């Protein structure tokens, strides 16, 4: 059983099951769940900038004063770029890398896709847009003992309800990483942002084994994730250190699937596609 979670009141509005959230809502939620990291980084800038500015004024040291001003400008510039980067990932431009991922996997037509996630249905909506004839079976796979290593995960889960607005999107819940879908019933499975939160050493391996089970012969596995690189570091800050590295995803997928392909989107998202053996 997962550890019980105490109800938290959020000031960001929750989604409504019968209405699809807008890209603006998803971008706003990404900013909201990142608020702790933004505040943590801000405190570092203030801890250096305020004393530096005070020294410059009190001791009439122009260099120290202007250094504090420059630090503030750098901080604001980084914040602006981070907000812009989050918009490109979670706002309207996000559909571009999902479309590219689907093309990388040569997926089209009346296919059945399992969207495997940790509590956000954004990926299911985007897949339904890019694949207008597809049926999307969206499965909440979060079933981790204890607290998440990232508090943002629970915020994400609290704010979005399983959708009922699209008849081509059907929501399910996994049971300890066992998927409630029949063997060889899907043409593709898709893993998206947040997959790195599923622990290795058992849980992640089981989930990908389940993905193999539900795939038809020759079925496709698709994955898009944040990378551990300078671009993502500027957008997310030091929290990006806990994501799975691109080379580790590549090795993990090649151990389980054939013909693994990789591409990098302009939104700093790593894209992978492979084929069931």
Model-derived features: where do they sit?
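Class I SAM-dependent methyltransferase SAM/SAH-binding core
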Residues: 120-178
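A short glycine-rich, Lys/Arg-flanked "PGG" loop and its adjoining helix->strand segment in the class I
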Residues: 204-217
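Conserved beta-strand signature within the Rossmann-like core of class I S-adenosyl-L-methionine
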Residues: 218-225
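Class I SAM-dependent methyltransferase Rossmann-like catalytic core
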Residues: 28-47, 57-106
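Short alpha-helix
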Residues: 240-257, 262
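Conserved class I S-adenosyl-L-methionine
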Residues: 109-120
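A short acidic, Gly/Pro-enriched loop at the edge of an enzyme's catalytic core
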Residues: 177-189
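Core SAM-dependent methyltransferase catalytic element
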Residues: 258-277
